[in-house]
Structures are given as C-alpha cells and as structure tokens.
UniProtKB/Swiss-Prot annotation:
Subcellular location: Cytoplasm
Protein name as catalogued: Adenylate kinase
Family: Belongs to the adenylate kinase family.
Species for this entry: Delftia acidovorans (strain DSM 14801 / SPH-1)
UniProt region (NMP), positions on chain: 30-59
Length: 218
C-alpha cells in the first residue's frame, strides 16, 4: 500500500495516518522526519541537505525527491509507505511523477474550513501537565481552569484563530491544487495514476478511520 494523505491543517491527518500505517504495516514518512534522519545518518544526500539548511536556505525539490527515493528503497518500505505532508506543491508532484515513484492511492480527508477553525481555535491546554481541553467538545469543569490544579488554561499560538486562518490560506494556495492535480490524473490515465479517494473528516475518530480503510479497499 503506497499512498499520499492529503488534507488541510487540523483535518486529522496525523491521527488517521497512525491507524492506516498500523493496518498495512507501513511507515509514515514526512519530509521533516526524513530530512532529520538523513542528516543524522550522514548519507551523502543528508550532508547536502544539512549544508543547505545550515545556510538558512530551503531544500530544493530535486534534493527532496532524491531523499524520497532513498527512503522508500529501505527495508521497512517493502509493503509500502504513507506520505504525510508531501508532496506540498504541484512542482513536487510533477517531480515525483517524473522520478517514477509509484503510488496506489491519494486519500484526501476533507473538512470544511469553518469546522477546522472551530476545532483548532477552541483548543486549550494546561502547560505544566500537557492536559488538553476544548471549549466546546471537551470543556474543563470550570471555564478557563485546569480540572486537577485549577490553574489557568492557555491557548497556544498555533491554535489562535488568525494563525489557523493564515495556515489555511497557505494550504489553499499551495497544497489544495494537488487535490485537483491527482483527481484529474486519475480521470485521464486510470491505469497509470494512483486512485484518488476523498472522505469526510467530520464525525468521530472511529467513523473517519472506517471511511479511510473502506476507501483504500475499493
């Protein structure tokens, strides 16, 4: 099972990726983890990536694609792999296609932006313990206070509404076009292209997992 998981920030990709990887016995590969592992291992590509990052520059798509090819050739990818957060852009998708990286599925977890904003901006946390709450879905017993200590809860910078909206804007302009890219490719070249599937990311975690696994069994 070789697949790409697409979806906006806050759509629940990380949670579903864990279930899918467990079901199929495949690793979850993110470019960040892949880069860190290559740098740590000191491979020639890892050394190139380190030099670029140390200079404060972005790693080129060519180098990323070469790292991807190196990563998916490893033994733990014998049964496949799940790409999380890659490709991010059309040029990266084109480069992956040109490099002959074969995929079985592209699975999109679709959640309306207003639901994502509500989901993320309602999160509150107790920094000392790591306990998390949600003002609507999992509220503390006393508003704004941790259930155990009574200490004030905080909203992380990443969860503030304006931050969430900015991240969704970036997703809309850079990554959302990939949905159309893979959908169009699947319609045009059904035999060569990965199967494109979209599922709703609304509802319970269990419901979404069932939808995801059913889509990957089609």
């Amino acid at each position: 099972m070789k697949l790409i998981l697409l979806g906006a920030p806050g759509a629940g990709k990380g949670t579903q990726a864990a279930f899918i990887c467990q079901k199929y016995g495949i690793p979850q590969i993110s470019t960040g983890d892949m880069l860190r592992a290559a740098v740590k291992a000191g491979t020639p590509l890892g050394q190139q990536a380190k030099a670029v990052m140390d200079a404060g520059q972005l790693v080129s798509d060519d180098l990323i694609i070469n790292l991807v090819k190196e990563r998916i050739a490893q033994a733990d990818c014998a049964n496949g792999f799940l790409f999380d957060g890659f490709p991010r852009t059309i040029p990266q998708a084109d480069a992956m296609k040109a490099a002959g990286v074969k995929l079985d599925y592209v699975l999109e977890i679709d959640v309306p932006f207003d639901a994502i904003i509500e989901r993320m901006s309602g999160r509150r946390s107790h920094p000392a313990s790591g306990r998390t709450y949600h003002v609507k879905f999992n509220p503390p017993k006393v508003e704004g206070q941790d259930d155990v200590t009574g200490e004030p809860l905080v909203q992380r910078e990443d969860d503030k509404e304006e931050t969430v909206k900015k991240r969704l804007d970036v997703y809309s302009s850079q990554t959302r076009p990939l949905v159309d890219y893979y959908r169009a490719w699947a319609e045009k070249e059904a035999a060569a292209a990965p199967k494109y599937r979209a599922i709703s990311g609304l509802g319970s975690v269990e419901d979404i997992t069932q939808r995801a696994l059913a889509a990957l069994a089609e």
